[in-house]
Amino acid sequence: MSDSDTRKALNRAIGYLGIREHSRQEIRGKLKRNGFSDETIEKVLERLDTLNLLDDLSFARNFIRSRTRVKPSGLYKLRYELRQKGVPDDIAEEALREYDSAAQCLNAALKKMPFLKGDQEHRRKKLHTHLVNRGFDSQTIRQTLDELLTN
């Protein structure tokens, strides 16, 4: 491994981070797929840390904010997606502390409501399935459905 390899890997990583924020694990995987050695990757990750360019907590918070703005999701789904992105569980949990599951569930339900046809029971079942698929927990779903569909 040479300084040239480290410089190339660092430039590549900075390029990735210039496009969007990445988790530490995502950068590690991208560099590995590009053929860089584990030793080079670790040096690059350390350098990115010293430059404050790599922060899993910031990444997780921004991911949650972005994800829920476009497609409201529940805690289960967000936790799973953060794990897929390589964010450690303790950092994911810290980022999710600020998340308002009830508000997001209501938002997801309100977005879906105009597209539901049929009687109230049919709409309730469809909406329930939609919210489960979005990763919301059953208690939050029940509260949301009661709030929206109670006459």
Swiss-Prot record:
<dbReference type="Pfam" id="PF21982">
    <property type="entry name" value="RecX_HTH1"/>
</dbReference>
<dbReference type="Pfam" id="PF02631">
    <property type="entry name" value="RecX_HTH2"/>
</dbReference>
<dbReference type="InterPro" id="IPR053926">
    <property type="entry name" value="RecX_HTH_1st"/>
</dbReference>
<comment type="similarity">
    <text>Belongs to the RecX family.</text>
</comment>
<comment type="function">
    <text>Modulates RecA activity.</text>
</comment>
<dbReference type="InterPro" id="IPR003783">
    <property type="entry name" value="Regulatory_RecX"/>
</dbReference>
<dbReference type="InterPro" id="IPR036388">
    <property type="entry name" value="WH-like_DNA-bd_sf"/>
</dbReference>
<protein>
    <recommendedName>
        <fullName>Regulatory protein RecX</fullName>
    </recommendedName>
</protein>
<dbReference type="InterPro" id="IPR053924">
    <property type="entry name" value="RecX_HTH_2nd"/>
</dbReference>
<dbReference type="GO" id="GO:0005737">
    <property type="term" value="C:cytoplasm"/>
</dbReference>
<dbReference type="GO" id="GO:0006282">
    <property type="term" value="P:regulation of DNA repair"/>
</dbReference>
<keyword id="KW-0963">Cytoplasm</keyword>
